[in-house]
């Protein structure tokens, strides 16, 4: 569905009720809608300058990026319970999607937006600075080159899953959790087990996000870091990227 002519808190909440009629009230209680509105307007206004979205997505920012992210954040928050004292990183964040929507929670973690490309994320850095928004940090670095010791990491539209596990493995502390945003259940399970093993992770559980079916199949996985990665991992981005191009499972949201 195309975006409303003008974004307002009212138009965003109206679409929220249309898309998630049984959960809208609970979802609305989780978020600071003034901040959601400001960020949504920013995404639209800076889209062309920052090259945030494709031509199709530029007409459906609310459904395909804002509400999709908000629903993911809502479901993850229900599982986590409290974000108090935690740090969450978003790998390959682009302009801050989905990571910034964790900052839009009323009770939010410290959010670290991670991307090696400054073209998109520098606009978000300016947005955060000009609006004096605290609790957001920026890392202009490749995920596999960074060691941040975070509690949680997310990704959406990043390197294809399961190779994204390898790419982010050093971002998390031991017992930290990686929650990739995923599409169809079409990955090679043997490959997934292999990457989980050498990256030091185990699968805790997987959850389908049925209310997002208007966008296609969506699901999330909760992956716990149980040990340091094996020697030699994570590999350089060029190696991970080359191998991932033959992967069946995709982290990209279509």
Swiss-Prot record:
Domain of life per record: Bacteria
EC code(s) of this entry: 2.1.1.-
GO cellular component: cytosol
Keyword line: Cytoplasm, Methyltransferase, rRNA processing, S-adenosyl-L-methionine, Transferase
InterPro entries named in the record: rRNA_ssu_MeTfrase_G, SAM-dependent_MTases_sf
Locations listed in the record: Cytoplasm
Broad class of the protein's primary localization: cytoplasm
Gene Ontology MF, one: rRNA (guanine-N7-)-methyltransferase activity
Role summary: Specifically methylates the N7 position of a guanine in 16S rRNA.
Family: Belongs to the methyltransferase superfamily. RNA methyltransferase RsmG family.
Protein name per UniProt: Ribosomal RNA small subunit methyltransferase G
């Amino acid at each position: 569905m195309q975006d409303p002519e003008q974004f307002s808190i009212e138009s965003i909440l109206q679409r929220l009720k249309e898309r998630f009629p049984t959960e809208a009230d609970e979802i609305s209680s989780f978020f600071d809608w003034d901040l959601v509105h400001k960020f949504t307007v920013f995404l639209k206004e800076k889209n062309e300058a920052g090259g945030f979205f494709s031509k199709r997505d530029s007409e459906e920012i609310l459904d395909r990026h804002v509400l999709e992210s908000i629903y993911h954040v809502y479901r993850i928050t229900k599982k986590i319970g409290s974000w108090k004292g935690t740090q969450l990183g978003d790998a390959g964040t682009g302009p801050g999607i989905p990571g910034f929507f964790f900052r839009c929670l009323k009770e939010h973690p410290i959010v670290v937006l991670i991307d090696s490309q400054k073209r998109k994320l520098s606009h978000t850095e300016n947005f955060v600075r000009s609006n004096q928004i605290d609790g957001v940090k920026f890392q202009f670095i490749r995920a596999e080159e960074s060691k941040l010791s975070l509690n949680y990491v997310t990704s959406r539209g990043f390197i294809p899953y399961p190779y994204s596990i390898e790419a982010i493995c050093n971002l998390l502390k031991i017992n930290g959790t990686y929650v990739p945003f995923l599409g169809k259940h079409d990955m090679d399970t043997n490959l997934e087990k292999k990457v989980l093993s050498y990256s030091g992770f185990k699968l805790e559980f997987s959850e389908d996000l049925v209310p997002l079916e208007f966008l296609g199949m969506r699901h999330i996985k909760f992956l716990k870091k149980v040990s340091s990665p094996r020697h030699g991992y994570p590999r350089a981005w060029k190696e991970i990227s080359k191998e991932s191009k033959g992967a069946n499972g995709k982290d990209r949201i279509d």
